[in-house]
Amino acid sequence: MKKLMIIILAVLFLISCNHEYQGVPESYHKLLDIAIEQAGDNAEEIKKAISESPAEQKEGMAFLISYMPERDLTSLGADFLLENVEYAYRAREEFSWCKNLPDSIFFNEVLPYANTSEDRDPWRKDFYERFSLIVKDCENIVDAIYTINKPINTEVKVEYDTRRSRVDASPKQSMEEHMATCTGLSMILTDAFRSVGIPSRLAGTGMWTNMKGNHTWSEVWVDGEWM
Protein backbone atom coordinates (compact mmCIF):
# COMPACT_ATOMS: atom_id res chain seq x y z
CA MET A 1 0.00 0.00 0.00
CA LYS A 2 2.80 2.40 0.88
CA LYS A 3 4.53 1.71 -2.43
CA LEU A 4 1.23 2.30 -4.29
CA MET A 5 0.77 5.67 -2.59
CA ILE A 6 4.29 6.72 -3.57
CA ILE A 7 3.58 5.82 -7.20
CA ILE A 8 0.28 7.73 -7.16
CA LEU A 9 1.91 10.82 -5.65
CA ALA A 10 4.72 10.66 -8.21
CA VAL A 11 2.21 10.46 -11.06
CA LEU A 12 0.20 13.37 -9.66
CA PHE A 13 3.39 15.41 -9.34
CA LEU A 14 4.32 14.75 -12.96
CA ILE A 15 0.82 15.64 -14.12
CA SER A 16 0.87 18.91 -12.16
CA CYS A 17 4.28 19.85 -13.60
CA ASN A 18 3.12 19.06 -17.11
CA HIS A 19 -0.08 21.09 -16.62
CA GLU A 20 1.89 24.19 -15.61
CA TYR A 21 3.58 24.29 -19.02
CA GLN A 22 0.85 22.62 -21.02
CA GLY A 23 1.41 23.14 -24.73
CA VAL A 24 5.01 24.31 -24.24
CA PRO A 25 7.75 22.12 -25.77
CA GLU A 26 9.56 20.18 -23.06
CA SER A 27 12.92 21.69 -24.04
CA TYR A 28 11.78 24.96 -22.42
CA HIS A 29 10.54 23.53 -19.11
CA LYS A 30 13.80 23.77 -17.13
CA LEU A 31 14.55 27.20 -18.59
CA LEU A 32 11.11 28.39 -17.52
CA ASP A 33 11.62 27.01 -14.02
CA ILE A 34 14.80 29.08 -13.74
CA ALA A 35 13.13 32.19 -15.18
CA ILE A 36 10.19 31.98 -12.79
CA GLU A 37 12.54 31.63 -9.84
CA GLN A 38 14.51 34.68 -11.00
CA ALA A 39 11.28 36.66 -11.41
CA GLY A 40 10.82 36.75 -7.64
CA ASP A 41 7.78 38.79 -6.65
CA ASN A 42 6.84 39.09 -10.34
CA ALA A 43 6.62 35.32 -10.84
CA GLU A 44 2.81 35.28 -11.03
CA GLU A 45 2.89 37.71 -13.96
CA ILE A 46 5.34 35.47 -15.81
CA LYS A 47 3.23 32.38 -15.09
CA LYS A 48 0.12 34.22 -16.28
CA ALA A 49 1.82 35.16 -19.55
CA ILE A 50 2.61 31.50 -20.18
CA SER A 51 -0.76 30.09 -19.15
CA GLU A 52 -2.84 32.66 -21.06
CA SER A 53 -0.92 32.41 -24.33
CA PRO A 54 -2.96 30.77 -27.10
CA ALA A 55 -1.72 27.31 -28.05
CA GLU A 56 -0.10 28.46 -31.30
CA GLN A 57 1.81 31.20 -29.44
CA LYS A 58 3.02 29.14 -26.47
CA GLU A 59 6.47 28.40 -27.84
CA GLY A 60 7.09 32.04 -28.73
CA MET A 61 6.16 33.14 -25.23
CA ALA A 62 8.30 30.38 -23.72
CA PHE A 63 11.25 31.49 -25.85
CA LEU A 64 10.96 35.13 -24.75
CA ILE A 65 10.70 34.26 -21.09
CA SER A 66 13.45 31.63 -21.18
CA TYR A 67 16.01 34.10 -22.51
CA MET A 68 14.71 37.29 -20.91
CA PRO A 69 17.09 39.54 -18.92
CA GLU A 70 16.51 39.34 -15.17
CA ARG A 71 15.52 43.03 -15.03
CA ASP A 72 12.59 42.19 -17.32
CA LEU A 73 11.64 39.01 -15.48
CA THR A 74 11.22 41.05 -12.30
CA SER A 75 9.29 43.93 -13.87
CA LEU A 76 7.32 43.11 -17.03
CA GLY A 77 3.62 42.38 -16.69
CA ALA A 78 1.70 39.58 -18.36
CA ASP A 79 -0.42 41.99 -20.41
CA PHE A 80 2.70 43.59 -21.91
CA LEU A 81 4.11 40.21 -22.92
CA LEU A 82 0.82 38.84 -24.22
CA GLU A 83 0.23 41.88 -26.43
CA ASN A 84 3.77 41.76 -27.79
CA VAL A 85 3.51 38.08 -28.70
CA GLU A 86 -0.03 38.41 -30.08
CA TYR A 87 0.91 41.11 -32.57
CA ALA A 88 4.13 39.39 -33.60
CA TYR A 89 2.09 36.32 -34.51
CA ARG A 90 -0.47 38.49 -36.30
CA ALA A 91 2.31 39.71 -38.55
CA ARG A 92 3.48 36.14 -39.10
CA GLU A 93 0.00 35.12 -40.18
CA GLU A 94 -0.66 38.19 -42.33
CA PHE A 95 2.55 38.68 -44.29
CA SER A 96 3.98 35.99 -46.55
CA TRP A 97 7.60 36.98 -45.89
CA CYS A 98 7.09 36.39 -42.17
CA LYS A 99 4.98 33.25 -42.52
CA ASN A 100 7.85 31.48 -44.26
CA LEU A 101 10.58 32.41 -41.78
CA PRO A 102 12.45 29.71 -39.85
CA ASP A 103 11.37 29.67 -36.21
CA SER A 104 14.89 30.60 -35.11
CA ILE A 105 14.77 33.84 -37.12
CA PHE A 106 11.21 34.68 -36.09
CA PHE A 107 11.95 34.11 -32.40
CA ASN A 108 15.22 36.05 -32.36
CA GLU A 109 14.65 38.86 -34.87
CA VAL A 110 10.89 39.52 -35.02
CA LEU A 111 9.42 38.51 -31.65
CA PRO A 112 11.64 40.49 -29.20
CA TYR A 113 10.10 43.53 -27.49
CA ALA A 114 13.42 45.41 -27.09
CA ASN A 115 16.79 45.98 -28.72
CA THR A 116 19.19 46.97 -25.95
CA SER A 117 18.75 48.92 -22.73
CA GLU A 118 15.86 51.16 -23.80
CA ASP A 119 12.72 51.50 -21.65
CA ARG A 120 10.30 48.62 -22.17
CA ASP A 121 7.43 50.56 -23.73
CA PRO A 122 4.53 48.72 -25.44
CA TRP A 123 5.28 49.77 -29.02
CA ARG A 124 4.26 46.71 -31.03
CA LYS A 125 0.48 47.19 -31.35
CA ASP A 126 0.89 50.87 -32.29
CA PHE A 127 3.58 50.09 -34.86
CA TYR A 128 1.64 47.15 -36.30
CA GLU A 129 -1.40 49.38 -36.81
CA ARG A 130 0.73 52.10 -38.42
CA PHE A 131 3.00 50.07 -40.65
CA SER A 132 0.78 47.14 -41.65
CA LEU A 133 -1.29 49.66 -43.61
CA ILE A 134 1.83 50.94 -45.36
CA VAL A 135 3.02 47.49 -46.50
CA LYS A 136 -0.36 45.79 -47.10
CA ASP A 137 0.07 45.91 -50.89
CA CYS A 138 3.76 44.92 -50.94
CA GLU A 139 4.44 41.72 -52.83
CA ASN A 140 7.73 40.77 -51.18
CA ILE A 141 10.01 41.57 -48.27
CA VAL A 142 12.34 43.85 -50.25
CA ASP A 143 9.42 45.98 -51.38
CA ALA A 144 8.17 46.14 -47.78
CA ILE A 145 11.59 47.22 -46.48
CA TYR A 146 11.82 50.14 -48.89
CA THR A 147 8.18 51.06 -48.34
CA ILE A 148 8.75 51.45 -44.59
CA ASN A 149 12.22 52.99 -44.72
CA LYS A 150 11.29 55.84 -47.05
CA PRO A 151 8.52 57.59 -45.04
CA ILE A 152 9.38 56.52 -41.50
CA ASN A 153 10.67 59.88 -40.25
CA THR A 154 7.48 61.55 -41.43
CA GLU A 155 5.30 58.80 -39.98
CA VAL A 156 6.79 58.94 -36.48
CA LYS A 157 7.78 62.64 -36.62
CA VAL A 158 11.33 62.08 -35.36
CA GLU A 159 14.43 63.75 -36.80
CA TYR A 160 18.14 63.37 -36.13
CA ASP A 161 19.17 65.72 -33.33
CA THR A 162 21.96 65.35 -30.77
CA ARG A 163 19.95 67.30 -28.19
CA ARG A 164 17.87 64.19 -27.41
CA SER A 165 17.67 63.31 -23.70
CA ARG A 166 19.42 59.93 -23.94
CA VAL A 167 21.26 57.78 -26.45
CA ASP A 168 19.22 54.62 -25.90
CA ALA A 169 15.82 56.30 -26.07
CA SER A 170 12.89 54.00 -26.72
CA PRO A 171 10.68 54.70 -29.74
CA LYS A 172 8.07 56.24 -27.42
CA GLN A 173 10.63 58.62 -25.89
CA SER A 174 12.01 59.62 -29.29
CA MET A 175 8.51 60.25 -30.62
CA GLU A 176 7.63 62.38 -27.60
CA GLU A 177 10.79 64.46 -28.04
CA HIS A 178 10.61 64.40 -31.87
CA MET A 179 14.34 63.78 -31.95
CA ALA A 180 16.92 61.01 -31.71
CA THR A 181 20.46 60.19 -32.76
CA CYS A 182 21.45 57.16 -34.82
CA THR A 183 20.77 54.69 -32.01
CA GLY A 184 17.25 55.94 -31.30
CA LEU A 185 16.44 56.20 -35.01
CA SER A 186 17.72 52.67 -35.59
CA MET A 187 15.56 51.33 -32.75
CA ILE A 188 12.50 52.94 -34.32
CA LEU A 189 13.31 51.46 -37.73
CA THR A 190 14.11 48.01 -36.35
CA ASP A 191 10.88 47.93 -34.33
CA ALA A 192 8.91 49.15 -37.36
CA PHE A 193 10.35 46.32 -39.44
CA ARG A 194 9.63 43.77 -36.72
CA SER A 195 6.06 45.00 -36.34
CA VAL A 196 5.26 43.76 -39.85
CA GLY A 197 7.27 40.57 -39.65
CA ILE A 198 10.54 41.73 -41.22
CA PRO A 199 13.50 40.25 -39.30
CA SER A 200 15.67 43.10 -38.08
CA ARG A 201 18.40 43.82 -35.55
CA LEU A 202 20.73 46.61 -34.50
CA ALA A 203 24.31 46.69 -35.71
CA GLY A 204 27.03 49.23 -35.10
CA THR A 205 30.58 50.23 -34.45
CA GLY A 206 31.86 51.51 -31.13
CA MET A 207 34.42 53.74 -32.85
CA TRP A 208 35.34 54.55 -36.45
CA THR A 209 38.95 53.94 -37.51
CA ASN A 210 39.55 57.70 -37.55
CA MET A 211 38.55 57.73 -33.84
CA LYS A 212 35.80 60.28 -34.53
CA GLY A 213 32.62 58.83 -33.15
CA ASN A 214 30.47 55.72 -33.38
CA HIS A 215 27.39 54.68 -35.32
CA THR A 216 24.35 52.39 -35.06
CA TRP A 217 22.17 51.13 -37.89
CA SER A 218 19.45 48.58 -38.66
CA GLU A 219 20.06 45.32 -40.48
CA VAL A 220 17.39 43.19 -42.17
CA TRP A 221 17.36 39.48 -42.98
CA VAL A 222 16.52 38.81 -46.63
CA ASP A 223 16.70 35.43 -48.35
CA GLY A 224 18.97 33.98 -45.70
CA GLU A 225 21.41 36.89 -45.50
CA TRP A 226 21.80 39.96 -43.31
CA MET A 227 21.84 43.24 -45.20
Model-based region annotation:
Residues 139, 144, 150, 162-172, ...:
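Hydrophobic/aromatic-rich core segments of domains that either
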